[in-house]
């Protein structure tokens, strides 16, 4: 289960609208965790030093990713552009309500900086849209907490 994808679906299921930071036109190329694991094992066996862009076969803008997830899970919400500072503030409030850190400022800047997209060929084969269709009935039903998955729930965020 991917936290970002699950929580986009959660927000679409539970909030009256979905906000994207800025214009939402920054891109992502999500890779399925099993594809990433297989890639790591394959490269570990080779013993070479290589740099691989671990990306999946589909490219989305953030706005389109939210729209596609909503369509697949059967939830239509307005997708609205919000100033980054407002989006961060709303994320902070929702984070407090769910007992998590919804998004950090560096994560938001990286996302908006188009850092999750390259021109490399995909390293994974599993399409996010296919995976989402397979999990549409359970995706986003429950919030997935980043902090609950950590043994030390404060250490990674103390310097942010």
Give a label for each model feature.
Residues 39-104, 114-160:
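Mid/C-terminal beta-alpha module of Rossmann-like enzyme folds, strongest
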Residues 21, 104-107:
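Residue-level signal for threonine
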Residues 10-31, 35, 39-48, 53-55:
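A conserved pocket-lining segment of Rossmann-fold NAD(P)-dependent short-chain dehydrogenase/reductase
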Residues 3-12, 34, 67-69, 96, ...:
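Short, glycine/charged-enriched secondary-structure capping and boundary segments
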Residues 1-2, 30, 88-93:
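Short, solvent-exposed polar/charged micro-motifs at secondary-structure junctions
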Residues 1-9, 26-27, 60:
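Flexible, glycine-rich beta-alpha linker
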Residues 4-7, 107, 127:
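Hydrophobic alpha-helical segments typical of transmembrane helices
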